[in-house]
A protein has these predicted regions:
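Hydrophobic small-molecule pocket/channel-lining residues, especially in calycin-type beta-barrels
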Residues: 1-147
Length: 147
């Protein structure tokens, strides 16, 4: 089965494919030390996009991104070196990348970032609702495409 043919929104993920450096840190604060590296690559068959990250100051991880239940949504299955597993809903359209999860374990999260005009930089951040309803800035993130 050619899943890519069934969900044309998957081609939007091509904007992420490749290697990126990533700066991240507490919202409004200095980035954590060390340069993080993130790669996105298609699993053969293009039904899933595989994301891998190495973050010297934190933890490494992987995510598997595929088609969501709605035509222009994706589902991101997240796994990290701490043993965390999370499932996020995700969109990527008009230069805006969003992810969110409403699960209370440990708290709801959402991410919004924008691509710059040439698609070489993505800037945004994560928010969390530690009490389940009040959103607060959590982590600032900037991705820069490697040449």
């Amino acid at each position: 089965m050619d899943h890519f043919g069934e969900n044309f929104a998957l081609e939007r993920l091509d904007a992420l494919v490749g290697g990126w450096t990533m700066e991240a840190g507490p919202a409004g604060g200095a980035p954590w030390p060390g340069e993080a590296a993130v790669t996105f690559e298609w699993l053969r068959g293009r039904a899933f996009l595989i994301e891998r990250w190495v973050v010297p100051a934190a933890f490494d991880g992987i995510a598997v991104i595929g088609a969501g239940e709605e035509p222009d949504r994706f589902r991101r299955h997240y796994f990290d070196g701490r043993g965390e597993q999370r499932i996020y809903e995700m969109t990527l359209r008009d230069g805006v990348w969003k992810q969110w999860r409403d699960a209370p374990d440990p708290f709801p999260q959402r991410f919004t970032a924008k691509f710059n005009d040439d698609g070489e930089t993505i800037s945004g951040g994560w928010e969390k609702a530690a009490d389940g309803s009040t959103w607060e800035a959590d982590i600032d993130v900037t991705y820069r495409k490697m040449s």
